[in-house]
């Protein structure tokens, strides 16, 4: 076997020296406070059983057998996409293999040469990778800073009157758990005739009536150019969809390379998406319990005097900033020794100095578990920070 080139060896060595070397670990035992399975749908027997019933309606193979433009466009896709469009109150939905594929597929294909993309500086890596593949010019604005966004819009609107301008943000940010003021953002977008693209990955299933997302909670559907909803988090399955006009769907089918040049999701994966949405549509208990647990977690933050190191968030993502890769890894190790699965988020995933513990709250976390993990954290902070 050939050796890894020396340049790559050096990059790996740098990661080790910076204490940011990543490894794959087995799924650990203990209380889950680190997965994105906010509603517990990944373990739902009802969703699994209904998936089998959906598959039995069709003569379906184990795999999709090809891309959707060839042999992979099974009838279950049409059913699921119609269901998604109806649930999310939009003209059309197009399923992609993952949220990553959806974002690189959208941003590499839709914005054109000389167009402008203004994106929140904390936008997900999949958005940033899509921007790298785009012919459009892209510029970041300060996190959730709408004044900075408007200043950039003024400048680029004056300099590029014939170009489309896209504003890109997330409804719930994956690392901080916070949200932008979407109402004001869309007022600004309308003022400058800009097109808004909202990634709803961490709002899907969690925010709004029946988890329809932040955009629908605020009744802003008609003001959005495109929404990206993903299914690997609260929905407990896999895949993603881009929501928008019928013409946008047609355009993506014709020009989005991550859609065109890949084997389609398996019919089982698509049936699971459909099954999870059927369950979500009638489910209120799981979302109610999740909201209660989030509020209890926030109350316990206050009770343990930890509010100064937590980022304010009403979402299922609660981030505790402990600066430094080594220190935050030590904090995570201490918590894990007590039987709680909480993962450190290291730089360069987040900027140096903003390393954090990322707590993910679920319907199945008990009040006792929440109280105990924050006591363990409080003891670590008292003795080490």
Language-model-detected regions and their locations in the chain:
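Conserved PLP-anchoring active-site segment centered on the Schiff-base-forming lysine
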Residues: 106-125, 150
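PLP-dependent aminotransferase class I/II
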Residues: 234-301, 308-310
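Active-site phosphate-binding strand-loop segment of PLP-dependent enzymes
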Residues: 139, 143-198
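PLP-dependent enzyme catalytic core of the Aspartate aminotransferase-like
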Residues: 45, 49-53, 86, 337-338, ...
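Conserved PLP-binding catalytic core of the aspartate aminotransferase-like
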Residues: 41, 289-295, 306-338, 361-363
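Conserved N-terminal alpha-helix of the aminotransferase class I/II PLP-enzyme fold
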Residues: 49, 53-98
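Active-site PLP attachment segment
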Residues: 210, 216-251
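Conserved PLP-binding active-site segment of the aspartate aminotransferase-like
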Residues: 34-40, 278, 316-325, 341-374
């Amino acid at each position: 076997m050939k050796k890894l080139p020396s340049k790559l060896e050096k990059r790996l060595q740098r990661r080790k020296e910076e204490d940011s070397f990543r490894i794959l670990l087995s799924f650990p035992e203990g209380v889950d406070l680190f997965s994105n399975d906010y509603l517990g749908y990944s373990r739902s027997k009802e969703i699994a059983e209904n998936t089998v019933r959906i598959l039995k309606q069709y003569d379906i193979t184990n795999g999709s057998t090809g891309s959707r433009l060839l042999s992979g466009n099974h009838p279950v896709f049409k059913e699921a996409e119609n269901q998604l469009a109806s649930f999310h109150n939009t003209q059309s939905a197009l399923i992609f293999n993952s949220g990553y594929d959806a974002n690189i597929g959208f941003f590499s294909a839709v914005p054109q040469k000389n167009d402008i993309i203004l994106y929140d500086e904390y936008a997900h890596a999949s958005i940033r990778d899509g921007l790298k593949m785009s012919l459009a010019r892209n510029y970041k604005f300060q996190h959730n800073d709408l004044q900075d966004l408007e200043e950039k819009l003024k400048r680029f609107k004056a300099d590029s009157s014939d170009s489309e301008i896209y504003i890109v943000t997330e409804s719930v940010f994956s690392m901080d758990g916070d949200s932008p003021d979407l109402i004001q953002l869309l007022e600004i977008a309308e003022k400058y005739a800009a097109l808004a693209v909202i990634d709803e990955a961490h709002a899907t299933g969690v925010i709004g009536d029946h988890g329809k997302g932040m955009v629908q909670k605020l009744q802003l559907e008609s003001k959005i150019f495109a929404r990206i909803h993903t299914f690997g988090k609260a929905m407990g399955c896999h895949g993603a969809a881009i929501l928008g006009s019928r013409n946008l769907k047609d355009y993506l089918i014709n020009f989005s390379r991550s859609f065109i040049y890949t084997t389609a999701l398996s019919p089982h994966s698509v049936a699971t998406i459909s099954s999870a949405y059927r369950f979500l549509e009638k489910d209120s208990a799981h979302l109610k319990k999740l909201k209660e647990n989030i509020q209890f977690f926030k109350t316990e933050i206050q009770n343990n005097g930890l509010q100064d190191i937590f980022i304010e968030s009403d979402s299922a993502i609660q981030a505790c900033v402990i600066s430094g890769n080594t220190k935050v890894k030590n904090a995570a190790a201490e918590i894990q020794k007590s039987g709680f699965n909480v993962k450190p988020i290291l730089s360069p995933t987040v900027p140096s100095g903003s390393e954090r513990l990322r707590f993910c709250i679920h319907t199945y976390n008990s009040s006792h578990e929440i109280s105990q993990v924050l006591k363990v954290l409080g003891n670590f902070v008292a003795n080490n920070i």
